[in-house]
Amino acid sequence: MSLIDMIFGKRQKSAAIARERLQIILAHERNGRHAPDYLPALQRELMEVISKYVSVNLEDIKVQVERQDDYEVLEVNIVLPEHQR
């Protein structure tokens, strides 16, 4: 909405304003989201699979999602015990 439109009374409909605000809120939430909801479950399942072969603690498995350009990158780091490397 331009300054002239605001002065002379041309108004957007409330539905259009609400939609615009919702799009802004959703964009901020998507950009501000640090960890997807599935990460804790993914970490537990990885622990179950890895523990079949190697003895590790849950704290030794780190799962992160990072944004690089237009892609989301899933990074998994597992600290293995010295004697099982």
From Swiss-Prot:
Prevents the cell division inhibition by proteins MinC and MinD at internal division sites while permitting inhibition at polar sites. This ensures cell division at the proper site by restricting the formation of a division septum at the midpoint of the long axis of the cell. NCBIfam families: minE, PRK00296.1, PRK13989.1. Disulfide bonds: none annotated. Belongs to the MinE family. InterPro entries: MinE, MinE_sf. Keywords: Cell cycle, Cell division. The keyword Transmembrane helix does not apply. HAMAP family: MinE. It comes from Chromobacterium violaceum (strain ATCC 12472 / DSM 30191 / JCM 1249 / CCUG 213 / NBRC 12614 / NCIMB 9131 / NCTC 9757 / MK). This is Cell division topological specificity factor. The lineage of its organism: Bacteria, Pseudomonadati, Pseudomonadota, Betaproteobacteria, Neisseriales. GO terms for biological process: cell division; regulation of division septum assembly. It comes from the Bacteria. The keyword Cell cycle applies. The gene is minE.
